[in-house]
């Protein structure tokens, strides 16, 4: 079973796998561990990763990058509107209202969803992992920003499904970094001791995230998270791009922003310049040849000037740092270390700001680029039964408060309740109790829209179906389980109606109105921490809730506490009936569309595979043409007649011309046939060359064998001690075989020497190898027969007592046996104790 962690970044992606030796970040086909988050569409196939990155300028309109932030967002979303101006490709509104990506693929215009494009990237990363692991990859853990909302997380989950992956967990990027940091630490405080608080700062290409985590031995708990969703490396790039657009506009009279390709080239150069300035404080040049209208442009920039231009960006570094301390109620002195990851944290001014805020040196023990993917791979290993990993519990948080709203018959309007406050532990489940006579709907939403980097606070609507009143017409008790799962996605996971069965009829006063007023009842399911914080109810409500919960579990015993003492109570039994729930999720792909996209992805993968095979076949023909043309005038020259060489050279030239004309776009089989046709002419020449190279070596080996056996025959005839044990008949056989081999070799050598190099050889290397094997099989067993061993005469023992017991020792065997028994008894007891020691 494969264990894979995927860091799905805005600009680049990383894949890590768990192996017996630990976690390893794997390289792609370009021997690069970083795969660009880029997909390019062509007339025949798609290019993904590094191959697509190389087409950003040449195929700008059909090369998609920076699509990560379109997940779960409508076309009318303000963020999408703001991004339009930065994109070289077109985005469109899909029939569902979501953002689509418009490209030309297979010679026709196509609109792809963000999920589909992300699935293409995931398929590539999956293929990379499979090529390294040599087995199928299905289970994985994928990283997402900690600020992703429910809709965005569901969208990424759909993308993993389209790519044929089983995502075991969507892991927050800062939590993955914390796991990669903590799981290897041997000096963490014990569970009963004060935890070690560590801040993790991740500034990538598009966003800035901060979290503070508490570590104990074998335990990680996220205390708080904060973020700036638009502050990242690309913002610093934009500062440089805008500066040089203005400078070159004045200096060279160029309107750079009107030309997409020019702007993309400038963006690439500015990114390189930014990285150089991180290591260099001096003036650095920026030069681009034939930039626009065949004009070469150049400019300079230094770190000091760059930082002045970035003052407003650098001012945004501190607020999230201050926010996590406020949320977690920690002081700067309580922070043990500050770990930084992400490409943009390499900017000296960013590091300086963070270090100055906390008043301590920053820690860089983690790989800034690969920490997230390593954490994801570790999480996948923890979740996978195939790996035994040190126990390490991870408690994440809910980034935004989540509330439920429902229609309240008692209040003749709507009621709401905050189910999961901000920074509530996750994953987590709670049970709410409602009293209803008919189906009802729960509306989930984020209750703090001002903190939400998303325009719509709605999450979903959940309709609880088939709710019926009790047999006496009173409201039924409905228990609804709500959950934030391991992916950070909220759901109403189940609903159950509690049926009351009475053993005898009796009229009892029903407190319908009171029950209606106490519709919302909540209890924590399974997990104990945060119970008091997570139930903001009055003591009276808590008491009513506990009594009500006990009623559902203990039956009639507690019912007496709720009813007036004068009313005689019937014997009551309860049972639960699961209720169906209909979900209406915000911007969620329906199952039918998901199935269609999965099928389309499979077809596109097959098309890419066929196109690759076609190109490989074409390249094989071209490669063969160049190889043979060079060798015909080189090492193969002596092995082909002049006429044949001229004819073959002409054929090769015709094939080369055909490749660039009529043969430029042919089916795979045409190239296969063309290569076979060329090889019928070229292979005999190649064979003659190879035979000529190998034949002398094999004849030399055969000659050495013959010489060796002749030497043995001579020694045998001279009756040397080494061979006197050999049988004369056998040696005659050896002599005969050796003489025959010598005659065969001399005959073939003479014939071959008379043969022209341009003709096929008289004797082939396979025949010589067979003759060597034949001679060895006959002669070697005979001459290597060992001499018979001569055993020395046995000597009489001088002392009989050394060979056994003597007179008077008749009882010794018993004694020895007893001693032996005593000796063996001790290990026996030890053996019995061994398992206990192992268990301890």
UniProtKB/Swiss-Prot annotation:
The modification Phosphoserine is found at residues 76, 393, 415, 546, 756. The modification N6-methyllysine is found at residue 773. The modification N6-acetyllysine is found at residues 53, 430. The modification Phosphotyrosine is found at residues 89, 336, 660. Keywords: Acetylation, ATP-binding, Cytoplasm, Methylation, Nucleotide-binding, Phosphoprotein, Stress response. InterPro entries: ATPase_NBD, Heat_shock_70_CS, HSP70_C_sf, HSP70_peptide-bd_sf, Hsp_70_fam, HSPA4_NBD. Pfam families: HSP70. One of its GO terms (cellular component) is mitochondrion. Belongs to the heat shock protein 70 family. This is Heat shock 70 kDa protein 4. It comes from Rattus norvegicus.
């Amino acid at each position: 079973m494969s264990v894979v962690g995927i860091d799905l970044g805005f600009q680049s992606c990383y894949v890590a796998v768990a192996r017996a030796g630990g976690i390893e970040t794997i390289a792609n086909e370009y021997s690069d561990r970083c795969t660009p988050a880029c997909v390019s569409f062509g007339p025949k196939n798609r290019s993904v990763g590094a191959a697509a990155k190389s087409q950003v300028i040449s195929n700008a309109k059909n090369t998609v990058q920076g699509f990560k932030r379109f997940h779960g967002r409508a076309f009318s979303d303000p963020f999408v509107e703001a991004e339009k101006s930065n994109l070289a490709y077109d985005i469109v509104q899909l029939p569902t209202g979501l953002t689509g990506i418009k490209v030309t693929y297979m010679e026709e215009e196509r609109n792809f969803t963000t999920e589909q494009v992300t699935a293409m990237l995931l398929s590539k990363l999956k293929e990379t992992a499979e090529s390294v692991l040599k087995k199928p990859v299905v289970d994985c853990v994928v990283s997402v920003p900690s600020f992703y909302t429910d809709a965005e997380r569901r969208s990424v989950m759909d993308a993993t499904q389209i790519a044929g992956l089983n995502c075991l967990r969507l892991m927050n990027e800062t939590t993955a970094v914390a796991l990669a940091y903590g799981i290897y630490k041997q000096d963490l405080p014990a569970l009963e001791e004060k935890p070690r608080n560590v801040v993790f700062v991740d500034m990538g290409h598009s966003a800035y995230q901060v979290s503070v985590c508490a570590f104990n031995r074998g335990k990680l708990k996220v205390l708080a998270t904060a973020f700036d969703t638009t502050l990242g490396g690309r913002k610093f790039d934009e500062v440089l791009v805008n500066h040089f657009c203005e400078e070159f506009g004045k200096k060279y009279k160029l309107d750079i922003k009107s030309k997409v390709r020019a702007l993309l080239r400038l963006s690439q150069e500015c990114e390189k310049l930014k990285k150089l300035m991180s290591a260099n404080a001096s003036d650095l040049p920026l030069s681009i040849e034939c930039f626009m209208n065949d004009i070469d442009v150049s400019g300079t920039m230094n770190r000091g000037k760059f930082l002045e231009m970035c003052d407003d960006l650098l001012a945004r570094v501190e607020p999230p740092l201050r926010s996590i301390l406020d949320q977690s109620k920690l002081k700067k002195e309580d922070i043990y270390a500050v770990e930084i990851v992400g490409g943009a944290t390499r900017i000296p001014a960013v590091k300086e700001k963070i270090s100055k805020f906390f008043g301590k040196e920053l820690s860089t023990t983690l790989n800034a680029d690969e920490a997230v993917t390593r954490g994801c791979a570790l999480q996948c290993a923890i979740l996978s039964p195939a790996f035994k990993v040190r126990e390490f519990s991870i408690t994440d948080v809910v980034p935004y408060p989540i509330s439920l709203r429902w229609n309240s018959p008692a209040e003749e309007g709507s009621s709401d309740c905050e189910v999961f406050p901000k920074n509530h532990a996750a994953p987590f489940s709670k049970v709410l109790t409602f009293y209803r006579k008919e189906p009802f709907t729960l509306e989930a939403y984020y209750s703090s829209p001002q903190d939400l980097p998303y325009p719509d606070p709605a999450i979903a609507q959940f309709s609880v179906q088939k709710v019926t009143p009790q047999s006496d017409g009173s409201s039924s008790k409905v228990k609804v389980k709500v959950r934030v799962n391991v992916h950070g996605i909220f759901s109403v996971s189940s609903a159950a109606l509690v049926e009351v069965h009475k053993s005898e009829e009796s009229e009892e006063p029903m407190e319908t109105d009171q029950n209606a007023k106490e519709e919302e009842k909540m209890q924590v399911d399974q997990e104990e921490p945060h119970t008091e914080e997570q139930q903001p109810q009055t003591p009276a409500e808590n008491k009513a809730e506990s009594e009500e919960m006990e009623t559902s579990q203990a039956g009639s015993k507690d019912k007496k506490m709720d009813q007036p003492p004068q009313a005689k109570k019937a014997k009551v039994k309860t049972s639960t009936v699961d209720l169906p729930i209909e979900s209406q999720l915000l911007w969620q792909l329906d199952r039918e569309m998901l199935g269609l996209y999965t099928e389309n992805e499979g077809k596109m993968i097959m098309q890419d595979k066929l196109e690759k095979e076609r190109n490989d076949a074409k390249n094989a023909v071209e490669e063969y043409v160049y190889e043979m043309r060079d060798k015909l005038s080189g090492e193969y020259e002596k092995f082909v007649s002049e006429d044949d060489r001229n004819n073959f050279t002409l054929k090769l030239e015709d094939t080369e011309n055909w490749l660039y004309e009529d043969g430029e776009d042919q089916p795979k089989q045409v190239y296969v046939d063309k290569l076979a046709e060329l090889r019928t002419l070229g292979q005999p020449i190649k064979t003659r060359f190879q035979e000529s190279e190998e034949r002398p070596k094999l004849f030399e080996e055969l000659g050495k064998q013959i010489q060796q056996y002749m030497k043995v025959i001579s020694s045998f005839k001279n009756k040397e001690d080494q061979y006197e044990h050999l049988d004369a008949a056998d040696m005659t056989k050896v002599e005969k075989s050796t003489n025959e081999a010598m005659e065969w070799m001399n005959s073939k050598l003479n014939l071959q020497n008379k043969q022209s190099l341009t003709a096929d050889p008289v004797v082939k290397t396979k025949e010589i190898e067979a003759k060597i094997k034949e001679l060895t099989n006959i002669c070697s067993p005979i001459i290597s027969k060992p001499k018979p061993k001569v055993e020395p005469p046995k000597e009489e023992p001088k002392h009989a007592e050394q060979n056994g017991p003597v007179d008077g020792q008749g009882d010794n065997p018993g004694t020895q046996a007893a001693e032996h028994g005593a000796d063996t008894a001790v290990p026996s007891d030890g053996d019995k104790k061994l398992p206990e020691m192992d268990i301890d």
